[in-house]
Amino acid sequence: MRHLINNDGTPFETSELQSLRDELDALDNDGRTEYRNQNASVIAQHVAVKILIVSGPGTGKSYLFLNRINHWYQQDAQAKVLVTSFVRKLVADLQNDIDGDEQLSDEQKGNITASTLHKFARSIVEQNHGTTDWRFQPHFRIIGQFWKDVVWGDALAFYPLLNKGEYAWKKFEEQLYNAEFEQSEEWAKLKEIYFKLCQFYNAAGFADLILRAKDALVENSQLNESNYFIIDEYQDFNSAEDALINQLVNEPKGLLVVGDDEQVLYEKLKSGKPTLIRNLYQNNDYANGMLPFCGRSSFHITKTAGHFIQQQREADCIEKIYLPIKTTDDSPKVQVIACATAPTAVDYIEKFVVDNKTAIDERKNKLAEGEEKDAFLLILTPAKEVNFYGESKKKIAKIVAEYQVENLYFSEDYYKILSYYSLANNPQNNFTFRKILFYEDIAEAKVHELIEGAMQNGQNLCDIDSEEIKISLQKCNAIKTIVETVGATIEEKIKSITSHISIVDKVRLKEDIARKSINQEEIIEIEHKEEEEAELEEIEVKKMGAVELLTIVGSKGLSADHVIIIGFDNVNMSWITKNAFYVAMTRARKSLHILTALKSGGARQSNGFLDQLPDDHAEFYSYKKTDHTKNQLQGKQGFKTYLNNLNSMSQQRR
């Protein structure tokens, strides 16, 4: 049986893939493991300069990355490697693997950079001080999720007659993602003033950061120190990111691109384009490879996910092989659970946590000690706030809170005080000053007047002769004095600060200051942490606790022993794509639970994805809160009938 790589760059033929799938599926456990390892080894040591790997969920791409890097160093001891991904956890895990690799010398390890694309772009733009058209001062800042709308509001203020709905930030952000701008006079003016504001603030948003990095590389190719590249999650790249990568990897000594067009998640979040990887698959300059065996998820989970993604496939989708690494195992079938109400669903979750408390506590300790990196349980939701569960969402939050790792990031109150303190130390920082004007609730018209005056006169905001500016600076200096008061307790400092600015959560603020005091030595590190948090908000990935509540989109790159998907109904999951649900299912290693709760957000039936689940590898149950029991139903039809009966009973009671 041949290995899954086409030297000539041609796509795999459908008929051959089917034959190979049948042959691979006929292998026993040892045969599957042997083939997986040999296939990955052949790909890792392949002579092709450019390789595209189609890699389904949990098929071992991290091992392939490390093996390919080792191969490159065997061929070229002076190689300089860049690995980039959207998923910070994957970057961190790969860095740990590199650090522990005994085949690589310390010098070689030092020549490997594993980074998120945003962090890499930031480095390029910082080194180049922006671009020729739009220069930055050293140490430019990142415009985080919340502040994007504030800065765009500042841009719109220059053109008050424009319709804010028609010229919304989301529409401009999409133009940045696509690296393609509307040609109308109105949009051209807004683009110009936005970039002028960024220069004035010495700050950039994540979307325009990518464009700036590409232009910086065009201006100065020496900024790229790498000659071997691994590009991960290529299916989620947008046009701007693709242009940056193409500029970066121009004539590489080695290039490995990895992705799966059926795992695209960021179409809505940042205009990801699965067509990019599909087009690359047709490009004969790249040898095409495939990883066929899922070693992460259990037999039934892999079979369920594999069956699901085969249903109603897009015509231009890349055909692939996706099989479990074992012919069978002891793990349960996928559990699809019907609940009468949201409190019933939460009771199911609570019972699962109670039943597994010993194992969860053990995982919590190992995560804290760095011996484990994955959660024990992921609770995945279509909507971040879980408002569709009503009051029951508080109980979920309480369950999760018990197993959280120490909060690595700080409260809004903390960052607010940081801004006042920072401005007192560096009043020339216009972006920080803009934050203070927001916190001080200065009228929009007045803020615009101040910004416009400063920009026209080539001044900083702190140089403007204005009562609002003077009062703001006085308040900043007062807070700086309080923060630096020797001998005062944290409680005393907070009490004094509240006489100047409002504080939402004094208890959390006290914890934050106790953990990291605000002072001049710490301020750069804290501001960097704030920007890291902004990047996490951009793509929703964070450090794991033993039990985590995450959005489906936010689960990208993660895995857990057990996964519970909530909101599986006709209302709350109606906007979740097939690809996103596929990704959610394949986060699970040992067990997967899919919960439909009626009356949550108006839900009256299960999600349409129910019909695309296989009968052979999923079991369907009702669950009752009164006695905490599951009762098996007769397949999907029995599941639907049970929900319909619940609806009928509910109507009769009215």
Language-model region placement:
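ATP-hydrolysis module of ASCE/P-loop NTPase motor domains
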Residues: 129-201, 441-459
